[in-house]
Amino acid sequence: MRRLLVTLLLFTTLAATACRSKTATLNLLVWEGYADPAFVRAFEESHHCKVSASYMGSSDELVAKLRGGSAANYDVISPSSDVATMIATTGLAAPLDLAKIPSYSQLAPQLTSLPLVKSGGKVYGVPFTWGPNPLLYDTTVFQQPPTTWAVLWDPKYRGKISVWDDLSTVYMAAQLLGYDKPDPGHLYSLSDDELEKVKAKLLELKPNVRKIWSTGGELTNLFENHEIVAAMGWPLMTNQLRQAHFPIGETIPQENTTGWIDHMMITAASDHKELATEFLEYLVEARTQKQVADVTGYIPANPGAAQFMSAEEQKNLHLDDVQNYQKRIYFWQNVPRRDKYNEIWNEVKAAQ
């Protein structure tokens, strides 16, 4: 009997090992920079799996794919704070077992305390990174950082400006019109009349727009080819352009800017939830968070990443003055009338 039990135990162990040794593939739908080999390769090697990423250009693209029947194609997604709640509360994401994500307790309390990815007493996502949508500019054209988003409307830069194909461009125009005063949250609940005025403001910008970019690669190419001199962008592009030795500057203008808190979530349709959970734990570990910051230039959700950074690196990421830096960023919120915002933005894009 004992021999039979030993044989069964050995068979079970070998079978489990064989199943684990099969190369599983985690499919990601995430923002650019969130599956870089610089930090993903180590996970692939230690877990004998492959991480395959598709990149999204906007929150609306993510939502469209999840709602359009493509959810089963992805295991892990990285929704921002404007759509994370909708995804967490509509059955598109799987609840997390936080006991299997021990690094969750190390994440910044001001992020984990937010209700963005919580529903019915369950948590559906882990904060990953956060940051602004800054104004990027060619330092050979601007010897001093531009002080206002209004520079994008300056007639001298006709055909030399780029804006993002995202509602962030709508928010930016609304800021110039003062709709963020006194409550920045009002940017995400504009009235029809306010949206019409935003539309008119953006139509005034059209002659200056060389191209409306939708991927980071598009924007970096526009700068490198000297087709544009200024744009709304991401810190990721600043990092990439500096690595390419392009004279790029980054600033938050006097009106401040919008920004995001990105989460990592597991889709409800994933067939690899256990492996995906291990991946989320890996991504929010302090050492990995430092590597993510190196690639993206985004602020890590795990403050422990700072222990692996030099004083200069911490300063570049504003970790030496996080609270004041956060005050300059109006983090994206759920937009109840998102369809109306998109209608306005699409009309701007279609206008000649």
Model-predicted regions and their roles:
Residues 1-26, 352:
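Short, low-complexity disordered leader/linker segments with a strong preference
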Residues 19-87, 220:
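Early extracytoplasmic/lumenal segment of secretory-pathway proteins
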Residues 74-78, 212, 229-234, 250:
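Paired acidic/hydrophobic, glycine-rich loop segments that form the ligand-binding mouth/hinge
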Residues 78-84, 88-224:
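Extracytoplasmic ligand-binding site segments that recognize negatively charged/polar headgroups
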Residues 84-86, 232-247:
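A ligand-binding cleft/hinge motif common to bilobed small-molecule-binding domains
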Residues 195-196, 201-205, 242-268:
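Periplasmic-binding protein-like
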Residues 258, 267-329:
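Mature extracytoplasmic/periplasmic domains
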Residues 323-352:
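Conserved C-terminal helix/tail region of periplasmic/extracytoplasmic solute-binding proteins
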